[in-house]
Amino acid sequence: MQLRRATMDDALDVLSWRNDETTRMNSFTQDEISQENHLKWFKKKLDDENCLMYILEDKNVKAGSIRVDITDEVGEISYMIAPGERGKGLGKAIIEQLEGISEIAGNDSKCQIRCLVGFVNEANIASSKCFKSNGYTELIAGDIKCYIKNI
């Protein structure tokens, strides 16, 4: 299992995962996203120097994606697991692997991330468990849970 940087070749897989009913149910934005809008957004994220986007591959199969948007030394995590790959512990693994990447862990001089955060809908129990099992501190505000970890 490994993380690699995302490319435009991954855009349609990520769109398919994002528009999956279960993914949408657990997302803050639950509407389906059009291919046209997604491709524009995906390219913009790939070109953004304050965004790091990765694909998780397990036995040469694309199994999920994880993105970190960096603002003022804080990296906000957003991830999803491909529908056919859920239930295999990959949510915990994708976060754990992200923390070991040199761009995130601080071994890359361009990266100044001091803290990672993830926001989770209260109903998304699986994602909450993934953050907790990776040592994140949970804060709750209404129906949103925030998970924080200094790195």
Residue ranges of model-derived segments:
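Acyl-donor (CoA/ACP) binding surface of acyl/acetyltransferases
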Residues: 2, 6-11, 57-151
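A short helix-loop-beta-strand connector motif used in the catalytic cores of GNAT acetyltransferases and
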Residues: 43-55
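Short, hydrophobic secondary-structure boundary micro-motifs
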Residues: 25-27, 54, 117
